[in-house]
Amino acid sequence: MSKSLEKYKLNAKEKNNLEKIEGGYKINKDLLIAEEYLNNEHNIILFDLKSEKKILNISFHQGYITSFHICKKPLYIDDKEIIYSNDSFYFLSSSLDKKFALHQISFNNSTNEYSNYTLISQCKPTHDEINSVIQIENGQILITARDQSLILFSNKIKNGNFEKLFEINQPWPMAPDLLFEIRNNLIGVSWEYDDAEADESYTEEMEKNNHSNDGIFIYSIDNNKIIEKKILHGYYFGGKYSYIVMEDKLILKKNSEIFVYNLNNYELKFKFQEYTYLKMKPLMKNILLYIIKMVLKQ
């Protein structure tokens, strides 16, 4: 298997059998692991690109998977190192059933054929739904949950149990959305103000304080602890974040707004409205793109 797992976007119009698949990771030239939305369920599937057939459906979480993440760094099960290789790979999943889990899929590397699936371990660390799970550069595991928690776990699993190392909590009623690693052990988490969970008095207090708990929080992972570095405030108008990291720049998009931050000092370098760009004439688009290019070089 290639050591650089390829993010693989699918075109539903080209392959009818892939109509419900959102995207996934290409494991080798014939196998794809992907998310599938079907009949109000969200599952993980293994798909054979050559035959265009689904060969494995993982619905361990009762059809309510919130995220999955390929493990590219070593894990240790009862002190034995495991890592993706020519005949197997490992991934994490999280769910609305308050669990996250570690899975293994084995295959014949010479024929690219699937051979076996194993649920290695599962963990129920909170009393609420788990939004996201990722493995970071040092091999450790992070999750966010709707009980306002961000939890760090060791990459060592003993007797089937994940070891919790550290936990932080945001004030109620903040809900996590995006969880991602910016670069080596530097983490971004978006905490969203959840109107549905707040009462009127709390809403008024938040508005007075300009929603001081919203936005992208930047954390470092150091000595098995989660350390808050910086808060990028003010983007609390609903919608989902997406992001790109380019060298020392963090580019965030939410709704129609795009923000460019310098990761050395977390200053906002540039922002613009996507719909403004789309309405521009070609010459003005080129000028704006040139300005953005210059800003990114600074």
Where are these regions (language model features)?
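Intrinsically disordered, low-complexity acidic/Ser/Thr/Pro-rich linker and tail segments
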Residues: M1-I45, W191-E197, Y202-F217
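A short beta-strand motif characteristic of beta-propeller blades
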Residues: E6-N17, K53-I58, T118-C123, N161-N169, ...
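Canonical WD40 repeat/beta-propeller blade segments in eukaryotic WD-repeat proteins
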Residues: L18-Y25, G63-I83, H127-Q135, W172-F180, ...
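Short coil/turn segments that connect the beta-strands within blades of beta-propeller domains
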Residues: K29-D30, D87-F89, N138-Q140, R183-N185, ...
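Conserved strand-to-loop turn within each blade of WD40 beta-propeller repeats
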Residues: E35-N40, S94-D97, T144-D147, S190-Y193, ...
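WD40-repeat beta-propellers
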Residues: I44-F47, F100-I105, I151-N155, Y219, ...
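Short loop/turn segments immediately following beta-strands, especially the blade-tip
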Residues: Q104-E113, S154-G160, I221-N223
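Blade-level signature of beta-propeller repeat domains, shared across WD40, Kelch, NHL, RCC1
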Residues: L283-Q298
